[in-house]
From Swiss-Prot:
The lineage of its organism: Bacteria, Pseudomonadati, Pseudomonadota, Alphaproteobacteria, Sphingomonadales. It comes from Zymomonas mobilis subsp. mobilis (strain ATCC 31821 / ZM4 / CP4). Gene3D superfamilies: 3.30.70.60. Residues 97-124 are annotated as: Disordered. Belongs to the bacterial ribosomal protein bS6 family. CDD domains: bS6. This is Small ribosomal subunit protein bS6. One of its GO terms (molecular function) is small ribosomal subunit rRNA binding. It holds the Pfam family Ribosomal_S6.
Amino acid sequence: MPLYEHVFLARQDLAQTQVDGLAATATSIIEEKSGKVVKTEIWGLRNLAYRIQKNRKAYYIMLEIDAPADAIQELERQMALNEDVIRYMTVRVDAHEQGPSAMMRRGDRDRSNRSDRRRDRDAA
């Protein structure tokens, strides 16, 4: 089966449990169509480059999917109907990344850089 990465943005006013529920709903849609979600990453609440439907921030969720094309079509149809989802994009990939995605690695790097700067500042 083809491999996909599906990223969607959820409204900023949702609770974390609702965001987790959106990811679970997407997973169940894929599994109903005989596909599987290999990995789910919730990148958290992030600033948007521009306002989307009056939202300045959004929760980012990424799914790595191994599923047939009709499962992806149904997932995208459901995303378009869901009012909590403000944007989504699905991309076909040749292979899934091993380990955390680039966004998750960037967050770890940013945290370590901040702690290094703080340590240098305190030492001075």
